[in-house]
Amino acid sequence: MQETGVHNGAHGADKFGLKNLKGIYWNFGAPQLYEHALRNGEAVLSADGALVADTGVFTGRSPKDKFTVRDATTETTMWWGGNQSITAEQFETLYQDFIKHAEGMTLFAQDLYGGADPSFQIKTRVFTELAWHSLFIRTLLRRPDRADLAAFVPELTLIDLPSFRADPKRHGCRSENVVAIDFARKIVLIGGTQYAGEMKKSVFTTLNYYLPERGVLPMHCSANVGPAGDTAIFFGLSGTGKTTLSADPNRTLIGDDEHGWGKDGVFNFEGGCYAKCIKLSPEAEPEIFAASSRFGAVLENVVLDEITRKPDFDNGSKTENTRSAYPLESIPNASPTGRAGQPKNVVMLAADAFGVMPPIAKLTPAQAMYHFLSGYTAKVAGTERGVTEPTPEFSTCFGSPFLPRDPSVYGNMLRDLIHNHNVDCWLVNTGWTGGKYGTGHRMPIKVTRALLTAALDGSLRNAEFRTDPYFGFAVPTALPGVPSDILEPAKTWADKAEFDKTARALVGMFQKNFAKFEAQVDADVRAAAPDVKIAAE
């Protein structure tokens, strides 16, 4: 077997059972991986120097094809209400079949860190069949110094083989596509899909399992910090604006998707960003556009002009879930450390497809826990397979597919952190105004940015607030530069009776969804629920 590149020879591929390989390329950088991806026909070049790849049938995550080994430990530590299980024996069969399938292949290996805080990071080794997948995960996780690679000993191992086809009867899975995690052995197997996001979310899921035991809250969020050292966290599902809103030229970016919050503050899990880029423009999102238009960026399912090879970011013919992966250092004001102090503000983003939520609301600590456990948003087109238009969704902790443990574990940790550090909490609707999806329109990003700026710089604290009659939270009545009507959703609807009917319906959905958490939360959190009786007055 031919091996090229720097790595720890005492902890090579053979330690994981990989054998009879044609070769391994260890820890290659972007130029080398570009060469291999282009030579192998995996990807093409854009006119701006980005590597552009198609992911085939799978243009989003497949949460129904994700499985975790159920053993004596995970029997009691896993949240089986939200996760699917396979037996240790089924995983071992799958693992051996992966090893057999890899024989004769040339693989790409990356040694990386999951987590910017050395006290809590997990050393991760990723074997990939495709060169562009190797570049993707090298971009998304954190890269060790070259001098540290020779002594790198992995704790978590991912094997990513898109050409592998699982057998549901043999492997205990659902289809030919599979993501399987064994927390005891710290091994992740990904087969049958070229969608690169499965790799990063598998590392995220692993950190979500281990970090609560060590007093760190893992979060599906973005984070940035202001000139005064004021850290802000933005919770939200894919497509709600985490990446866009955290890329603020007046604030330092910590990260766009995954973070931990512990006794020393906030730290990024990653070293790159993974931005939705449908309708990406230099006017609306200049920093993300620039980062996606240069050497080192990886574009997924983005259509190129046949002649100019310029990306057509407005073209969603392959999927609405077009993506751009780029290193954090491509953002001019990104933090080199990926770490920041204790948050001053927590923002919960919701793409309200009903168009009845205000653009911003201030939450009490009890309301914050209620809305964190509810995780209301809309499934935005293309983020998961089979979703072609936004539909209402409650995803607990704003990341249900990535939660190995019971949601109450994360909710209680958030409650304590908010209380201990006197954090201000906000709910922001980045979804629809002037009507529900189909009749209204998306909330203008300029409005959202103006409201967020006022919240984060403290000026919104001094505003006059009204109590929303449906949801009970505090909504500002006026803010310079923001149309007053947009702050009161009912005024943006032509049909006020239809607004009332729609708002009441959403209140009922919140109550129905939260019923499963009522026995696990304190009375003040139950009292923070939207109230149909209020809405009916």
From Swiss-Prot:
Chain positions covered by the region annotation Disordered: 311-342
Residue positions binding Mn(2+): K201, H220, D257
Binding positions for substrate per the UniProt entry: R61, Y195, K201, R323
Pfam family, one: PEPCK_ATP
Pathway info: Carbohydrate biosynthesis; gluconeogenesis
Cofactor dependency: Mn(2+)
EC number(s) recorded for this UniProt protein: 4.1.1.49
Major site of localization recorded for this protein: cytoplasm
Database matches in InterPro entries: PEP_carboxykinase_ATP, PEP_carboxykinase_C, PEP_carboxykinase_N, PEPCK_ATP_CS
GO CC terms, sorted: cytosol
GO function terms (MF aspect): ATP binding; metal ion binding; phosphoenolpyruvate carboxykinase (ATP) activity
Compartments (UniProt record): Cytoplasm
Family, as annotated: Belongs to the phosphoenolpyruvate carboxykinase (ATP) family.
Task of the protein: Involved in the gluconeogenesis. Catalyzes the conversion of oxaloacetate (OAA) to phosphoenolpyruvate (PEP) through direct phosphoryl transfer between the nucleoside triphosphate and OAA.
Stored HAMAP family: PEPCK_ATP
Protein name in the entry: Phosphoenolpyruvate carboxykinase (ATP)
Gene it is expressed from: pckA
